[in-house]
């Protein structure tokens, strides 16, 4: 695979994307098998950034299932897979979360928002035209997932417990109310992602703004 330099500054992020199309062909389209096959791609990358031989790369699992590198002083990482894209985010000194979703029609987006999002978020979506509502729904969803993953929590924690504000006709999502999270919304940074046509995603972390260096890796 094309290798990204493992020399990473403490003040930056690395966002690496893998093309899952070839893996899908190998696995006959099974999402689970695609995920397992990609371990052969992202484990060597993590080993380089952690500064350990691949054979010594050890993962630990947090109380709510978030994986991390077990070696002391290792960078934090997070992984997301949807459709033909796998994203691997790596950073030092902060806990991060990343999510990516395929933009597919979701006729019940507003009903889902009314059930699982905050009342303010659902009302903001309802005020948008249908096309804008669909995209804004995915922006909110990926932002929420990225924050929950950075916290090391799953969807069961509650999508409504991390609240966002829609701006610019639903094209921008800003942290608003994280009353039930480990830090207030003002402590969080959110970076919107569009890794490929037809996809939206988000990268979330607590702390100062950092530059994000992106790499596209292929077998």
Residue ranges and their predicted role:
Residues 1-219:
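Core catalytic alpha/beta fold that binds nucleotide/phospho-ligands
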